[in-house]
């Protein structure tokens, strides 16, 4: 008889047929065509597989339904049935022997053939039972498998039985007894045929097993291969549990199965895919620490796929929007005015997950900021006065001073004894078309883009990115260092109400400029510069000019919403004053402005003054100890001798003086202009600054511009007085040579400063220094403005670097009282 291979697939087909035949009512025929993960091995680690399945069934703790009981139940039933069948065969054999004892040993061919068939059936049945009993329980019980292999007592009993049968056959062969002789002849013939048949079947089964294994490797279906399934029995799966993958065969034998190598969560080693090939029918994994428990379950796969799809549905549109947003922002290579690029290195090592969900994508989320340099990017939702502290450090140092002539920040500035020498940051946090014409040049007159309101309305969703780039790049830390180096000691910083809040219908970019305002103050602190806060845009517009945010009607204290906007403006000051009343600002924010240039020539003077007193009391009640600045409203300064004689303490009057918006002054020649400043303005400022006048007075705005030629200075699309294009109905030129000629032109005034003649530079510096001298008879001055894109005569920075401004503001070359220098051959028409 052929040796019994340990390959489980060798008799798999007959095992299935045997089960069908023996248990026709209990076998589930719908699962005969099983898909197997098979490797033809001769030395499976069946103990391991037994452990896997046994642990799994003990863990699950369930009962099997009829027809699908555990293998051990099959074994007990098989043994009983086999015993009954053997009894039938023995009884039949005894009857046959009794019948044959009285007959001739030579029987007819028909009888011999029938006996041979019976003998063949009996031998085949015995052989099937031997293999069936062996195969069914080899996986389920490792000890029984070892006995079958001959290593245990059971194996020795099997060998003794085999030897006993062979001995009995030999005795029959040697006996002359007719019964024995007949039996022997039949058994030998049957065994010879059976041997030949089995060898053929073995070859067919091996070929079949090889083909089946090859086909199965292609399918790679995720089916569990447990003991019963390997022999054609359907393995019961507990309800609501998915099958685990159990690998067997050569992979397991070589230690390459998942139980042998599986990277756990937090464990080391290569990824699962690198350890376990996806070929050969593999389609999953097993957790080696809990054999039989699935790592990937079918339901989890479906849920996972659904989650991935959902994430893609969310992420792709967001990525498109973010990509569009970043296209509107400069990339990492965009240079700032000083040639540097925006720095976001302080985000390194931090996670966007540190930002709460409610703050993601808002002005509180530093991952949405264009520039995080010198901001504290640690998240906080803390507020003071309802205004965010996000971006601020918790410590500060007030020991700096801008120069030796000025006390450090932690020492009081001697207002009234030492003049303010400062500069404005106009056109930065509150746009002004002539300072940054690039925002407006690309639009036609028909577009109606004339101010920040219409600009942000036109920009729509891209306004935030566009303006934040401007906030981050137009004024940088280097500017504050330069302001200090220029000998200046104060900075007047403009902001508008939308830095604090916005209202329904507002297109303005809300709150972003607030962060840059706070950073600017910290830069001022670093370089010892004191700050004057100045709200340029008030709800409703206080003057109807473009730098108030919206050009047109005045809606503050005036018109249908005048009272509403009055209330709103006080609410803004309530918040802002509470914020800047913090100790950290007491030494650096030393002047607190109420409103820039309220047009009291159009507004009720009484209404403006009443609001001014109420606002002053409000902010002082909230803790502001700084000087409170109010603008003169374009009233004649002499009138302020009798205005607000009884007022709150610590108030300053702010006046803005220009020679180019007055048609009687713009026509003066160069020398006459300097004389006007030193003779008239100086006396005017000195008078209003006295106790007989209003009292402490500063000049919050002035420039060295001697023409109104700067682009958009007189509003977007408006001409100039200098060239006679200001009015659509009047072409009169207002310039020194208007009557005598030649005709005045803006070409020279708007030329690049490098083209300025030495005489023109000399005039511009003398003109500037004369104004400094005049305004220092009061509390001091703030030049308008520090930087422009193209209007050189309005940029202190350009003039300082271009050589037509004193290198140190506190050390001018000219003072009122000095002889006005000769400007040589400088033409009067520019």
From Swiss-Prot:
Record SUPFAM superfamilies: (Trans)glycosidases (SSF51445)
Keyword Repressor annotated: no
Extracellular side, ranges: 323-830
Segments of skewed composition (Acidic residues): 35-51
Main location: membrane
Biased composition (Polar residues): 330-348
Enzyme Commission number(s) from the entry: 3.2.1.58
Domain of life: Eukaryota
Residue ranges of the region described as Disordered: 1-279, 327-351
The reaction(s) this protein catalyses: Successive hydrolysis of beta-D-glucose units from the non-reducing ends of (1->3)-beta-D-glucans, releasing alpha-glucose
Any GO molecular function: glucan exo-1,3-beta-glucosidase activity
Keyword list, A-Z: Carbohydrate metabolism, Cell membrane, Cell wall biogenesis/degradation, Glycoprotein, Glycosidase, Hydrolase, Membrane, Polysaccharide degradation, Signal-anchor, Transmembrane, Transmembrane helix
GO cellular component, one term: extracellular region
UniProt subcellular location: Cell membrane
Function: Glucosidase involved in the degradation of cellulosic biomass. Active on lichenan.
Protein name stated in the entry: Probable glucan 1,3-beta-glucosidase D
Lineage: Eukaryota, Fungi, Dikarya, Ascomycota, Pezizomycotina
């Amino acid at each position: 008889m052929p040796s019994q291979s340990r390959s489980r697939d060798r008799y798999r087909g007959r095992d299935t047929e045997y089960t069908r035949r023996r248990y026709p009512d209990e076998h589930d025929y719908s699962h005969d065509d099983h898909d197997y993960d098979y490797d033809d091995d001769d030395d499976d680690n069946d103990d391991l597989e037994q452990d896997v399945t046994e642990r799994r069934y003990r863990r699950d703790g369930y009962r099997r339904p009829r027809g699908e009981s555990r293998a051990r139940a099959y074994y007990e039933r098989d043994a009983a049935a086999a015993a009954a069948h053997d009894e039938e065969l023995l009884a039949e054999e005894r009857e046959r022997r009794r019948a044959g004892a009285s007959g001739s040993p030579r029987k007819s061919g028909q009888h011999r053939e029938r006996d041979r068939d019976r003998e063949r059936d009996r031998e085949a049945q015995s052989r099937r039972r031997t293999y069936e009993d062996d195969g069914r329980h080899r996986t389920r019980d490792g000890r029984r498998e070892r006995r079958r292999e001959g290593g245990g007592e059971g194996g020795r009993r099997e060998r003794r039985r085999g030897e006993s049968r062979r001995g009995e056959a030999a005795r029959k062969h040697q006996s002359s007894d007719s019964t024995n002789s007949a039996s022997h002849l039949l058994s030998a013939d049957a065994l010879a045929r059976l041997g030949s048949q089995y060898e053929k079947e073995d070859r067919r089964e091996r070929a079949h097993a090889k083909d089946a294994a090859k086909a199965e490797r292609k399918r790679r279906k995720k089916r569990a291969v447990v003991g019963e399934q390997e022999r054609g029995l359907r393995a019961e799966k507990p309800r609501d549990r998915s099958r685990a993958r159990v690998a067997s065969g050569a992979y397991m034998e070589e230690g390459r199965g998942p139980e042998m190598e599986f990277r756990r969560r937090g464990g080391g080693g290569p990824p699962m895919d690198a350890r376990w090939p996806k070929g050969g029918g593999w389609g999953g994994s097993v957790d080696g620490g809990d054999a039989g428990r699935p790592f990937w379950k079918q339901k989890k796969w479906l849920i996972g796929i659904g989650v991935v799809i959902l994430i893609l549905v969310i992420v792709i549109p967001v990525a498109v929007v973010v990509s569009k947003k970043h296209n509107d922002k400069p990339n990492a290579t965009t240079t700032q005015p000083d040639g540097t690029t925006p720095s976001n290195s302080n985000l390194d090592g931090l996670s966007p997950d540190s930002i709460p969900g409610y703050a993601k994508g808002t002005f509180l989320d530093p991952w949405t900021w264009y520039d995080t340099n010198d901001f504290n990017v640690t998240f906080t939702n803390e507020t003071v006065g309802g205004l965010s502290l996000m971006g601020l450090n918790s410590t500060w140092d007030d020991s700096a001073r801008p120069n030796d002539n000025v006390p450090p920040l932690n020492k009081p500035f001697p207002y009234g004894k030492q003049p303010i020498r400062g500069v404005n940051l106009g056109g930065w946090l509150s746009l002004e078309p002539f300072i940054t014409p690039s925002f407006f040049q690309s639009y036609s007159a028909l577009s109606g883009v004339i101010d920040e309101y219409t600009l942000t309305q036109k920009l729509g969703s891209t306004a935030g990115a566009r303006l934040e780039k401007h906030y981050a790049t137009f004024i940088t830390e280097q500017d504050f260092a330069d302001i200090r180096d220029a000998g200046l000691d104060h900075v007047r910083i403009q902001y508008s109400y939308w830095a604090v809040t916005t209202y329904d219908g507002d297109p303005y970019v809300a709150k972003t400029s607030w962060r840059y305002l706070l950073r600017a103050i910290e830069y001022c602190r670093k370089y010892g510069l004191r700050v004057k806060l100045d709200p340029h845009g008030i709800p409703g517009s206080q003057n109807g000019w473009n730098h108030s945010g919206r050009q047109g009607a005045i809606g503050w204290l005036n018109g249908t919403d005048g009272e509403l906007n009055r209330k709103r403006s006080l609410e803004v000051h309530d918040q802002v004053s509470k914020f800047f009343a913090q100790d950290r600002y007491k030494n650096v924010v030393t002047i607190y402005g109420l409103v820039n240039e309220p047009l009291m020539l159009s507004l009720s003077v009484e209404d403006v003054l009443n609001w001014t007193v109420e606002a002053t009391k409000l902010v002082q009640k909230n803790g502001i100890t700084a000087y409170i600045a109010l603008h003169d409203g374009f009233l004649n300064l002499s009138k302020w001798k009798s205005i607000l004689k009884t007022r709150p303490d610590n108030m300053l009057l702010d006046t803005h003086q220009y020679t180019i918006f007055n048609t009687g002054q713009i026509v003066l020649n160069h020398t006459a202009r300097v004389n006007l400043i030193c003779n008239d303005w100086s006396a005017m400022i000195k008078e209003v600054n006295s106790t007989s006048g209003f009292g402490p007075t500063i000049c919050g705005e002035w420039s060295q511009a001697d023409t109104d030629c700067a682009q958009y200075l007189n509003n977007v699309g408006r001409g100039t007085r200098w060239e006679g294009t200001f009015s659509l109905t009047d072409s009169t030129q207002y310039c020194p040579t208007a009557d005598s000629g030649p005709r005045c032109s803006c070409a020279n005034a708007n030329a690049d400063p490098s083209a300025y003649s030495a005489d023109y530079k000399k005039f511009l510096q003398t003109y500037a220094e004369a104004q400094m001298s005049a305004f220092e008879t009061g509390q001091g001055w703030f030049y308008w403005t520090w930087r422009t894109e193209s209007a050189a005569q309005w940029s202190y920075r350009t003039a300082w670097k271009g050589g037509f401004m004193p290198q140190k503001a506190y050390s001018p070359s000219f003072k009122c009282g000095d002889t006005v220098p000769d400007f040589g051959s400088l033409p009067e028409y520019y």
